[in-house]
Amino acid sequence: ELKSEARIKGQDLSDYYGMWVHQIKTPIAAMHILLQSVEDENPALPELKEMKMELFKMEQYVEMVLTYLRMEDMSGDLQFEKVSLDKILKQSVRKYSQMFVLQKIRLDYRPVERIVLTDEKWLEFVIEQILSNALKYTKNGGEIRICLEEKRGRECLVIEDNGIGIQAEDLPRVFEKGFTGYNGRADKKSTGIGLYLCKKIMDKMGHKIWINSEVGKGTRVYLELTRQEWNPE
């Protein structure tokens, strides 16, 4: 009985957050319209860049909450199909195109020409989160590279940046829920949820993810998309 009550309360809380997320999308859309109006009237306004970046971050946080809530019933939401990896990559890059321009970050990406068996929507979220982190921790004028490499005898998608890197003592914990590490403490804006969600999603899809990094040189995120056993837990 206690478990049943806890489950009901948990569902009520999830429903509340879900409603909140959908409702907050309306003022965010209105802010986009207002910001566009300001830009039309005064395109040289120095604060425009910062306003755009902060609004984009707000959208990402809302999307992260929505994904976190959907994780509860992810198993019933998975739809595996053969899909072009380039299609997913291009959609993800397009979403962040404004950030690449605003931060003057170069993208080194050539079509990988691979078909993968995956859930397009969930894999796209994972790639978006990795790009978001790369942009967040790469200085203006830096570079992000997307390519294929063979690791552990398997072909992997690699998303690499030449940003600030991750401290060696933090690397084993980057996928822990709520862990922000040195970079997160310095940045004071990290939620410690993005990479946690990536790992959970990749595990449930039977894919693999791991990270190599060196402070001052950058970070490489590896996605092994050959499907292992599906894990619905």
Please report, for each region that a protein language model flagged, where it lies by residue.
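Short conserved segments within the C-terminal catalytic ATPase subdomain
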Residues: 99-109
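Short helix-loop "hinge" at the ATP-lid/N-box region of the Bergerat-fold HATPase_c
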Residues: 134-135
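Short beta-strand/loop element within the Bergerat-fold HATPase_c
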Residues: 141-153
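Acidic ATP/Mg2+-coordinating residue in the GHKL
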Residues: 161
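Short conserved segment of the HATPase_c
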Residues: 166-179
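Short alpha-helical Gxxx[C/S/T] motif in the catalytic ATP-binding
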Residues: 194, 198
